[in-house]
Amino acid sequence: MKKYKDNFNNIIIMSYCIVTGSGGLVGSETVRFFSNIGYNVVGIDNDMRKYFFNTSTQSITDILKSKYSNFTHYNIDIRKKDELETNIFKKLGNNIKCIVHCAAQPSHDWAAKEPHTDFEVNAVATLNLLELTRKYCQKASFIFMSTNKVYGDNPNRLDIEELETRWELKGRGSIDENMSVDHCKHSLFGVSKLAADAMVQEYGRYFNMNTVCFRGGCITGPNHQGAELHGFLSYIVK
């Protein structure tokens, strides 16, 4: 039994998980999870939240660096494919078992302020990561934190029933991934995330890669660096 346990430990020691947006709400929790189960975790975060919203994730990054000896942080802009390749993907190669892509420009209003920046961060940078994964660690799992905003305003067309304490979907339990993402208004943020979402799916089907999109919405928590344009629940509580 000890032999098998040792072999398992050796596998984990050589296994790396890449987390983009590692100082953010979801990214930092992902770092904690994979660090706690024994993976070497590489976090990528250049604190663009400071540029977007004048708030910072640096304090979260500092906590992670001090707490986890198996966590390494890289201050790299995910739009810079060459830096990602040289510093991380080329060095680690097939030892990368998982990429959890959480980094994003996450605000509807901010996207309209700088559409090019929004699309480069959300869509083009996702393509960078997909290509590097395909080139250096094609069997790795690629997990993309998408958004329910890919559905645009299509949910507004659903039949809603007013109950005593809440609104509920009439005649159906929930909304699944079969809902259309087409013929609707999204916001520029929703469109850039939709482009990335579709690309992640396509790399899975076209190149037979292990990809998945998680379409969350209005996520918050104790480590959310809330700002007026993003993370509003956290912002008003603080």
Whereabouts are the PLM-identified features?
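Conserved non-cysteine loop/helix-boundary elements of the Radical SAM core domain that shape
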Residues: A227
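Glycine-rich phosphate/pyrophosphate-binding beta-alpha loops
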Residues: G231
